[in-house]
Amino acid sequence: HLSSNDALEKVAEARDKGLPAYAETCPQYLFLSIDDDMNKPGFEDAKVVFTPPLREKWHQNKLWAGLKKNTLQIVSTDHCPFCFKEQKELGIGDFTKIPNGGPGIEHRMQLLFSGGFSEGRITLNRWIEICCTNPAKMFGLYPRKGTISIGSDADIVIWDPNKEYTISAHTHHMCTDYSMFEGKKIKGNAETVMSRGEVIVKDNKFFGKPGRGKFIKRDSYGTAWQ
């Protein structure tokens, strides 16, 4: 989970030498910072205790540039949720007892579309690459996953680029009582999600059934290394 320009420069240096160096970052490092999201009242700062920690805001533009230049290939989430009540609050009086991690899996694509493509930081194709194609290649799942092609699984998202909403713990579907991105206004959201040709999300409602997942045998190495 690359979070700083210092680490980004090391990755760029290795890639410039022709080494097979790959890296990813997470939405919290692209949208949150020490400057804007720390020093909150009470124990609120515990909501953004994770590893690596937040950095100064100036690192964000460097990370966006790394995504654009392909120094960074993927944006993941480091989704490791704990509720604020009764879990994060275990660290009141002792920082070392704060559970390390935060929720984020639900809003990865929306944040990157709204803050990346819509604001001109990355192209539409690049958004798809860092969210879908590159992860499939890295993990040895391409071309079964990560592309809409003959012979590939029909994993398809129909995207509404004009859908506007505000991220909130009151409306998200994650089983946690807070959001790291509470109050952030977003433009763009999934209208329909299909998995292997079956509609599992429609108009913000989930229709998937427990047990429908299938084992997928991966290649021994991803196509990114070839």
Task: Give residue spans per PLM region.
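Histidine/acidic residue-rich metal-binding segments in metalloenzymes
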Residues: 1-75, 83, 91
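Conserved active-site and cofactor/substrate-binding residues in soluble primary-metabolism enzymes
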Residues: 2-6, 58-62, 100-108, 122, ...
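Predominant activation on well-ordered alpha-helical scaffold segments within soluble catalytic domains
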Residues: 8-12, 61-64, 109-114, 132, ...
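Residue-level signal for inorganic ion chemistry
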Residues: 24, 78, 112, 197
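His/Asp/Glu-enriched, well-ordered alpha-helical/loop segment
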Residues: 42-48, 74-75, 81-161
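A short acidic, glycine-rich active-site loop
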Residues: 47-58, 98-103, 179-185
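C-terminal cap of metal-dependent C-N hydrolases
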Residues: 89-94, 100, 150-216
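Short, solvent-exposed cationic patches
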Residues: 215-226
